[in-house]
Amino acid sequence: IPLPRRQLYGKLNHLFRIWVTGADNLLDDEDKCVLPLALPGSSRVMREVVSIMAADRILWHLLTRAVADGTITTREADALANESLRLLLPSAAQEASEESGVTQRPSPAYVLNVIHLLKTGLLFNIPFLGIDWIEKQIDSGRVARLKQALRQFGGGCQILDDIRDMARDFIEHRHNYLLSLLARDKPETLADRSHRKLSVSDRLYFHVPWSSL
């Protein structure tokens, strides 16, 4: 892959990081800085909004410059712009389905193989955007193996989030692999917790250490 296109793909990956992390910050009231901004006041929400808007404008400039330099064609730039949104939609749809809370806990296998795949696993295939649409000479079998490995790695990252966010997900009725394990194997533990006052910062996993093994 020529150096100019490799550099373009790397820059696109940073934009995806801004979009994904910025959205997570808004959804989970977190403060992971991905684009340093000097804004008046201390509003974290508006900082994330501006970061996401800025990343969108940066994408336009990157693609326009890449076309002007002959790095990619106009058609390829259009494909990258369109796919940059489409790749984020499965995760967005899964997050949207949990905003009002889930009424029942699905099986741990379903959480692991379906929900975590949509929410996080597929996001780890984003670095292949340019390869999928432009680099047709690349070994497709090798790409498929790398994608599968990265999807599994992404699922592992989501499990770590589930451990950390057990209390938040319990209170807000969101999908969580460990909570689904408890619902299946130790429903009395979940019932007991439902009668106690919890905060999202509680380290609930300390009380059920076996569930993370």
Map each language-model feature to its residues.
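Transmembrane helix-loop-helix
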Residues: 71-77, 206-213
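All-alpha helical catalytic cores of prenyl diphosphate-utilizing isoprenoid enzymes
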Residues: 49-162, 167-170
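Helix-rich alpha-solenoid scaffolding regions
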Residues: 11, 18, 44-54
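A short glycine/serine-rich beta->alpha loop
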Residues: 2-5, 44-45, 113
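Short, mixed-charge, low-aromatic patches
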Residues: 10-17, 80-83, 174-181
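Acidic, Mg2+-coordinating active-site segments of isoprenoid diphosphate-utilizing enzymes
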Residues: 21-43, 128-138, 151-211
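Conserved N-terminal diphosphate/IPP-binding helix and adjacent helical/loop segment
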Residues: 1-38, 94-107
